[in-house]
């Protein structure tokens, strides 16, 4: 019965008597996730299951259909591949809810072993005891190969013994009879099942039938009613926020007859709906209290702030208007300065020379002088003392000495300085008397200085000392620390200069690296422990991916695991016979014959480690692939070359002998001379010829570069000529450039570290040798050689193709061959054809050139047909053009169209140019290839190696079919779920790298929080995508609130790098999970800087804490924003990002910004700058903006802005007011306001603006102290203060939501007013308000002043120009009159007719479009059959309005002139149309000949229309017509190009239909500001049906169609006719009868009896399309 055990390997065979419990009649499979399947993945089936998400809990569950016993499990992998499962657990369940693991003998969850290396190998496990269950869940843990993350299974569940006794099946009870099939003589059925019980364990099935019928309904004549299918859902009752929609059905399927019952149930269903959230405009919070003054005196500052959080703006609502913070001066009084005395001056001369005199001295209170209420100096300013007390003589003596004495002091001089502290001086003379007869000189100074004080001098500011450093911004890893200083030492005063230099410094901090947790390397297996008698395989792994560092956790789990039994065959008991030694292992059975040379060099400073790595890899390679089919030669080289072992094809060495030989040999020292190794390899292959069918390979191992290239090109050429493949392995820090010389395909150069696992590396080497790591490729070649060197070039082309065939074989790569010149010859056109490699080479050798001029268009069309019809379903498709000159029979436009058709089939197009015309070929190929790098120029083709060209082609062929993209990610994760969100961000980046590679997309990453850090950018070189993925996995979050401005600034620097590729698409993806605190203005500035550099910004919000406004600001299109939950699948999010990047693939580059349209903001509207781009390749998709606008010159014009400040007398109010009207002046710091009492009907507050003003905005605020405000109000306006007009028919404007914030409303007036009244309607508490008006003066804004002479000269010049223009216009008018008289009168061509114009032709006319500026939005135009209409005639349509009078509002005329000279795709630029004319001519009641009037019932108010005039026409409206001149914001928003983006595909048939075509560029037309706007326009609605849906935009278009002669037979009710259709998005059939006089359509019914509807599309020569559409309808 077999060997039973709880854990082990494959049994010798299938146990006897096993029953398969998985049958097609009872089986059900379901899985946790699937990339393939699950379908029915049973053993030996083509169905299989592969897990999509590998996270240790993936599972495949089989429902056996009943509870049973099983004791044997079997698994396989994906058929025909190596994708399988090496380990898995099994869980079982009785009820499908509670699952338990199958346990081993140790009581732990049993680990089952799957097949190794082969998806078709069956691996079974027998259990020691049967398990009872209905549900069996397989929980795979690891794939077959560690580097392959695919988990794929096919399963079997069997019962071999201990099976319960057989259970025979028994029928269940009969079900009730079902409904009768017909109203008369129908049948009814009932059924039963064989499930009570079901047959199991070999039991017999039920006997008898499982279905019975009986006759029912004997036709008594009654018919019960039946419901029709539900109709379409109506539109949502609201345009935003929750509403209701409904649908209906009727009791007509069938209708009740002859007393039959009516239908039961409702005829109407309704359900909630929501088109979108209503926009929520942001509102300011209350101002915070004033902060403390920064200075006690001398002028300080106080601050208060508010936030835009009451409410936060949402769903596209406007941000708050105004400033977030205010500052005020405080304590401006000067600081007190107390006075201080100057030093005493010198004593004066004594007043007498004898007899007792006095002398004095003074001081001044100026050191400093008292100021700002400072205390004056204490004490006196003069000191007097006696002097010369001696007695005077009684008589004079001539010899008595006369001492000198000073005269009085002179006047003080002026102060020595103009500001601050200075001095003044005065002097005296010694002449009162002068000294004589030996008398003494005057005592004391002759001059005196005193202080003086002028105005204060300016004080320049000076910095205080730096403050302390702040804490580091990150806990580990690089961070920033900051410190600050203030400009207060001293603070600048008296107009002094401010401090220079920054007030902030930063420094790097936290040099301690963040902990890095260890990660396991891939498993690597050891050789079997025994060659016979059953050994075991072990596998090991290392904790080095990455190694734990800086305190990080070590890896969890075991380093070594026992694997499965191996070499279980019995050991031989008799001596072996004499034969060549055993050389191989079973593992090499699926590989071809290989003659393989290993060249090993280890000469670096780390040569011991690198050489051991190389030697271990070679040993593992030999162990894995054996030596039967692979024969080996090994050389070791450095400065010299030594052979370790040579080929021996007769008796090849055994695995052990090979391993012993390489293990014994040491590395050779000295410089690495790679040229010598290449020459030795060539010698080895010459000495010992290779086996006939063996592939020749050289694998080079090196850990350093050669001192010089040593002419490697010449050394490797003989190897290439001998068809030897060279694979290079650089171990350690080896420059790849040298290795790329000998291995031209970058995929053939492997860069690894010495710690790389030998098992994984040996597999990578074999994958490159056999090219089995590439996908299925269908590659087509188109060859053309017509230059003077065509013979040599054509041979070169064939050599290149032959090299690709020889290197890549014919298993995974299939070929087609086209040769073209003026004609196209398809030599090989079926990718599904199975050819041998020799057959394919023979096809290439026999290719014959096609002469004459090149017609590349024909080759592209032939290729498109081949790939569409003959390509394999899952293959990568590549088309390569090989040419030596330009295609003279093709133009850029036709090439664009034909290559676009190829790209629709997902074909990557490459081109190779040979010879002297490579530059010209490259210019033409810009219309063919996706990016310039897809063109390969080979000007010096004789010198270029065939292998280099061939491998360059194949390397590019393996790239993804994408344009070049320079892609930067800015990641910020600071929410409460930051770990989960940052993990999703990193995994999304990794998914992009894994899916799309690093060749066509270059990457950069910025991580930001409160600061932005660039982790890597386009200048960072990554050897392969695995290294980049590893780099992304090591990213760490940045702390703090996300500063979007800092992130965008850093991104701007990234896109300024010289490494940004000129032809690459530049993309920034911002991923955040929290609200940003960035200033909106700063953010807009950075966004514009990126847009100026043509950077596409995509915003991705992760989680629930991001605000839509943050993402909306940074993107120029709301479709460029994504929202993702934390459980979003990473691959799906990556695909959504790529789809946004590729959406506008067919658009050209943006043009430069235009000049600003205005020099300043007028009427609240700033100027605009415009840039445009064209739809270069429509078939690739042009789903993006064509026109981009930005605001510019936002400063208000002179004379524009808030009116005021107004005098108190300018504010007046209605009589019943409780407060003065002047309190209505808007003042955010004033807590009072004007209030209206008793809610007076029509009460108001009036503002006299003092002059006529064009008002464009009003603002209101509530009363803060009473917490009262107005929530809605309306306006009236007047020019003279007597006659007031309601603004917009007294439409209510939104007021305030609190008492503190200011609410603004934009208004649109067409004339100036002086008086504005605010009428409160709804309010909170009491109707209290402050108000302000914004407007512009009516006077003309004058240019800068000029001199009188300049003005006079300018005026003369203008008059001359005007006279010339007047003469030209007069001449043109005379010519027009002559034309009219001759053509319309004399020739009889002037009669007007009903209908639109078309020219008489024998084929259908094209559709014509009306120009934007000349189109009008008529709802429906009557269509009148006429025999003939002239080209230049016009149609007039009058629409009658039923208001308070019987007169129509006007007549609208338009006309079209056509061009008969050529059949072409006509666009708006080719149509010459009259400008719409507005006429009051119809007021008289007379209708022009040929016009049609649409009349309406006077009592039918619901169907009446209003048509409002455009702004240009409304200037002449009377006062009462104010309402007609207003264009609402909602209409202005709808009439943009973006409105059509959502609807453009609705004009087309589904993609699967034969008439499907790409985006129809010529129907992109939007309304202009000069057109009529429509209000209350509900009579005609959108036509329902596949061509026009409810989401259709307002895209006016006109079609004209002329039926062919006899195309509508009279027998079918048809007749020759013309049709017109002028519509906004299509017209639905009116509900009223066709003869209702409201339409005036009697006698105008049109029958199209041939077909009900249809569409035809014809391509035109210039690349456009001509489309026709027809349908039948009333009138």
Swiss-Prot record:
It is found in: Membrane. Residues 1-1356 are extracellular. Residues 1481-1491 have a biased composition (Polar residues). CDD domains: vWFA, vWFA_subfamily_ECM. Component of the acid-insoluble and acid-soluble organic matrix of the aragonitic skeleton (at protein level). Residues 595-769, 778-958, 966-1141 form the VWFA domain. Residues 168-220, 224-279, 281-336, 338-393, 403-458, 460-515, 517-572, 1144-1198 form the TSP type-1 domain. SMART domains: FA58C (SM00231), TSP1 (SM00209), VWA (SM00327). Residues 1463-1480 have a biased composition (Basic and acidic residues). Its main location: membrane. This is Coadhesin. The lineage of its organism: Eukaryota, Metazoa, Cnidaria, Anthozoa, Hexacorallia.
């Amino acid at each position: 019965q077999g060997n039973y055990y709880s854990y082990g390997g494959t049994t010798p065979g299938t146990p006897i008597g096993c029953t398969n419990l998985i049958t097609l009649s009872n089986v059900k499979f379901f899985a946790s996730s699937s990339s393939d399947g699950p379908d029915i993945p049973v053993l030996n089936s083509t169905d299989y299951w592969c897990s999509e998400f590998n996270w240790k809990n993936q599972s495949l569950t089989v429902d056996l259909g009943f509870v049973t016993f099983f004791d044997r499990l079997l698994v396989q992998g994906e058929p025909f591949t190596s994708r399988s499962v090496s380990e898995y657990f099994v869980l079982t369940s009785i009820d499908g809810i509670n699952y338990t693991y199958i346990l081993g003998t140790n009581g732990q969850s049993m680990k089952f072993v799957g097949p190794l290396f082969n998806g078709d190998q069956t691996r079974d496990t027998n259990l020691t005891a049967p398990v009872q269950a209905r549900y069996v869940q397989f929980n795979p843990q690891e794939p077959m190969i560690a580097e392959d993350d695919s988990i794929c299974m096919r399963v079997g569940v069997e019962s071999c013994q201990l099976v319960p006794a057989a259970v025979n099946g028994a029928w269940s009870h009969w079900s009730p009879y079902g409904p009768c099939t017909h109203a008369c003589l129908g049948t009814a059925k009932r059924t039963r099942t064989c499930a009570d019980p079901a047959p199991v364990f070999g039991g017999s099935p039920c006997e008898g039938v499982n279905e019975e019928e009986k006759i029912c309904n004997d036709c008594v004549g009654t018919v019960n009613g039946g419901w029709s299918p539900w109709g379409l859902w109506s539109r949502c009752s609201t345009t935003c926020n929750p509403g209701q929609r409904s649908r209906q059905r009727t009791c007509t399927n069938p209708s009740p007859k002859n007393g039959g019952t009516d239908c039961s149930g409702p005829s109407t269903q309704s359900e909630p709906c929501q088109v979108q959230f209503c926009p929520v405009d942001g509102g300011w919070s209350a101002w915070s209290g004033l902060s403390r003054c920064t200075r006690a005196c001398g002028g300080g500052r106080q601050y208060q702030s508010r936030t835009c959080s009451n409410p936060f703006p949402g769903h596209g609502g406007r941000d708050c208007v105004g400033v977030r913070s205010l500052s005020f001066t405080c304590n401006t009084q000067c600081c007190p300065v107390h006075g201080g005395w100057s030093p005493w001056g010198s004593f004066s001369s004594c007043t007498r020379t004898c007899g007792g005199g006095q002398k004095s001295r003074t001081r001044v209170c100026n050191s400093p002088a008292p100021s700002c209420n400072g205390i004056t100096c204490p004490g006196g300013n003069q000191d007097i003392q006696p002097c010369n007390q001696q007695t005077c003589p009684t008589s004079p003596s001539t010899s008595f000495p006369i001492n000198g004495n000073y005269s009085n002091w002179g006047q003080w001089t002026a102060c020595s300085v103009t500001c601050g502290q200075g001095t003044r001086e005065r002097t005296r003379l010694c002449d009162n008397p002068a000294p004589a007869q030996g008398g003494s000189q005057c005592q004391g100074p002759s001059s005196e200085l005193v202080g003086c004080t002028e105005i204060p001098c300016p004080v320049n500011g000076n910095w205080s000392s730096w403050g302390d450093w702040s804490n580091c911004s990150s806990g580990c890893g690089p961070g920033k620390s900051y410190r600050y200083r203030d400009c207060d030492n001293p603070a600048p005063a008296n107009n002094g200069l401010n401090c220079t230099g920054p007030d902030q410094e930063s420094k790097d901090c936290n040099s301690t690296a963040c902990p890095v947790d260890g990660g396991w390397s891939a498993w690597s297996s050891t050789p079997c422990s025994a060659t016979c008698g059953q050994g075991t395989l072990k596998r090991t792994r290392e904790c080095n991916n990455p190694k734990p560092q800086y305190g990080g956790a070590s890896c969890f789990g075991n380093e070594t695991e026992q694997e499965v039994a191996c070499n279980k065959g019995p050991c031989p008991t008799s001596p072996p016979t004499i034969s060549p030694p055993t050389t191989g292992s079973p593992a090499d059975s699926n590989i071809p014959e290989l003659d393989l040379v290993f060249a090993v060099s280890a000469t670096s400073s780390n040569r011991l480690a690198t050489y051991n790595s190389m030697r271990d890899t070679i040993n593992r390679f030999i162990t894995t692939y054996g030596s039967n089919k692979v024969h080996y030669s090994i050389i070791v080289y450095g400065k010299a070359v030594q052979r370790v072992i040579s080929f021996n094809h007769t008796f090849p060495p055994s695995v052990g002998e090979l391993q012993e030989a390489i293990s014994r040999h040491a590395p050779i020292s000295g410089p690495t001379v790679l040229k010598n190794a290449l020459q030795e390899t060539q010698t080895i292959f010459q000495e010992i010829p290779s086996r006939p069918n063996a592939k020749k390979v050289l694998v080079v191992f090196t850990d350093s570069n050669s001192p010089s290239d040593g002419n490697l090109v010449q050394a490797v050429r003989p190897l290439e000529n001998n068809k030897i493949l060279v694979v290079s392995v650089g171990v350690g820090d080896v420059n790849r450039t040298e290795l790329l010389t000998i291995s031209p395909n970058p995929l053939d150069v492997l860069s690894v570290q010495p710690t790389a696992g030998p098992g994984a590396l040996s597999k990578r080497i074999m994958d490159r040798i056999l090219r089995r790591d590439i996908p299925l490729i269908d590659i087509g070649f188109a060859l053309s050689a017509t230059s003077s060197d065509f013979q040599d070039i054509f041979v070169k082309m064939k050599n290149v193709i032959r090299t690709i065939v020889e290197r890549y074989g014919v298993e995974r790569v299939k070929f087609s061959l086209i040769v073209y010149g003026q004609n196209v010859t398809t030599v090989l056109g079926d990718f599904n054809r199975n050819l041998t490699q020799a057959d394919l080479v023979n096809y290439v050798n026999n290719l014959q050139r096609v002469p004459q001029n090149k017609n590349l268009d024909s080759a592209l069309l032939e290729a498109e047909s081949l790939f569409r019809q003959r390509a394999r379903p899952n293959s990568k498709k590549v088309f390569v053009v090989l040419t030596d000159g330009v295609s003279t029979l093709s133009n850029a436009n036709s090439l664009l169209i034909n290559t676009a058709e190829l790209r629709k089939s997902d074909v990557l197009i490459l081109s190779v140019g040979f010879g002297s015309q490579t530059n010209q070929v490259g210019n033409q190929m810009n219309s063919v290839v996706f990016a310039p790098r897809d063109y390969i120029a080979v000007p010096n083709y004789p010198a270029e190696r065939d292998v280099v060209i061939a491998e360059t082609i194949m390397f590019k062929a393996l790239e993804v079919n994408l344009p070049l993209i320079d892609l930067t990610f800015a990641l910020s994760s600071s929410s409460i779920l930051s770990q989960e969100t940052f993990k999703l961000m990193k995994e999304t980046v990794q998914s992009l790298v894994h899916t799309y590679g690093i060749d066509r997309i270059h990457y950069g990453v910025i991580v930001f929080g409160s600061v932005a850090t660039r982790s890597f950018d386009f200048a960072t070189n990554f050897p392969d995508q695995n290294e980049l993925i590893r780099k992304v996995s090591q990213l760490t979050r940045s702390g703090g609130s996300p500063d979007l401005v800092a992130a965008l600034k850093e991104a701007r620097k990234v896109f300024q790098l010289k490494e940004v590729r000129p032809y690459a698409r530049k993309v920034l993806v911002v991923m955040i999970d929290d609200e940003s605190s960035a200033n909106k203005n700063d953010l807009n500035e950075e966004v514009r800087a990126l847009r100026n550099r043509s950077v596409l910004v995509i915003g991705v919000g992760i989680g629930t804490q991001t605000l839509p406004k943050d993402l909306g600001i940074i993107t120029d299109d709301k479709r460029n924003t994504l929202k993702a939950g934390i459980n979003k699948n990473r691959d799906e999010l990556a695909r959504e990002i790529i789809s946004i990047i590729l959406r506008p693939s067919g658009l050209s580059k943006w043009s430069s910004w235009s000049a600003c349209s205005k020099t300043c903001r007028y009427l609240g509207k700033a100027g605009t700058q415009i840039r445009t781009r064209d739809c270069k390749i429509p078939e690739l998709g042009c789903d993006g903006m064509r026109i981009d606008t930005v605001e510019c010159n936002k400063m208000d014009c002179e004379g524009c802005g808030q009116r005021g400040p107004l005098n108190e007398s300018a504010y007046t109010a209605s009589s019943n007011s409780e407060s003065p009207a002047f309190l209505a002046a808007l003042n955010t710091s004033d807590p009072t306001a004007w209030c209206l009492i008793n809610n007076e009907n029509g009460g108001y507050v009036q503002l006299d603006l003092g002059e006529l003003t064009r008002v464009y905005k009003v603002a209101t605020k509530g009363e803060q102290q009473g917490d009262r405000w107005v929530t809605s109000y309306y306006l009236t306006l007047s020019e003279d203060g007597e006659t007031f007009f309601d603004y917009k028919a007294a439409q209510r404007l939104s007021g305030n939501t609190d008492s503190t914030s200011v609410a603004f409303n934009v208004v649109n007036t067409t004339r100036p007013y002086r008086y504005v009244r605010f009428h409160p309607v709804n309010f909170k508490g009491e109707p209290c308000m402050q108000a302000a008006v914004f407007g512009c003066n009516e006077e003309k804004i004058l240019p800068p002043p000029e001199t009188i002479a300049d003005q006079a000269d300018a005026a003369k010049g203008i008059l001359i120009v005007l006279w010339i223009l007047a003469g030209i216009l007069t001449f043109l008018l005379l010519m027009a009159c002559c034309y009219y008289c001759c053509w319309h009168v004399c020739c009889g061509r002037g009669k007007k007719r009903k209908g639109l114009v078309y020219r008489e032709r024998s084929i259908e006319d094209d559709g014509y479009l009306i120009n934007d500026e000349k189109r009008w939005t008529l709802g429906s135009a009557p269509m009148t059959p006429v025999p003939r209409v002239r080209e230049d005639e016009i149609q007039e349509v009058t629409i009658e309005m039923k208001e308070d009078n019987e007169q129509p509002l006007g007549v609208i005329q338009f006309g079209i002139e056509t061009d008969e000279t050529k059949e072409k795709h006509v666009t708006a630029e080719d149509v010459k149309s009259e400008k719409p004319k507005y006429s009051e001519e119809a007021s008289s009641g007379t209708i022009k000949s040929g016009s049609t009037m649409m009349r309406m019932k006077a009592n039918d108010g619901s169907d009446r229309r209003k048509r409002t005039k455009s702004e240009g026409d409304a200037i002449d409206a009377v006062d009462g017509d104010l309402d007609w001149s207003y264009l609402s914001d909602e209409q202005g928003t709808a009439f943009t190009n973006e409105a059509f983006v959502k609807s453009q595909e609705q004009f087309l048939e589904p993609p699967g239909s034969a008439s499907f075509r790409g985006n129809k560029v010529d129907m992109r037309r939007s309304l202009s500001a000069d057109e009529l706007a429509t209000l209350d326009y509900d009579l005609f609605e959108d036509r329902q049906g596949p061509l026009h849906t409810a989401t259709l935009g307002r895209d006016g278009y006109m079609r004209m169609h002329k039926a062919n002669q006899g195309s509508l037979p009279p027998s079918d009710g048809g007749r020759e006719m013309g049709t017109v259709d002028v519509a906004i998005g299509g017209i639905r059939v009116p509900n009223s009868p066709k003869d209702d006089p409201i339409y005036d359509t009697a006698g105008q019914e049109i029958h199209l009896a041939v077909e009900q509807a249809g569409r035809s599309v014809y391509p035109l020569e210039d690349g456009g399309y001509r489309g026709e559409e027809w349908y039948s309808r009333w009138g």
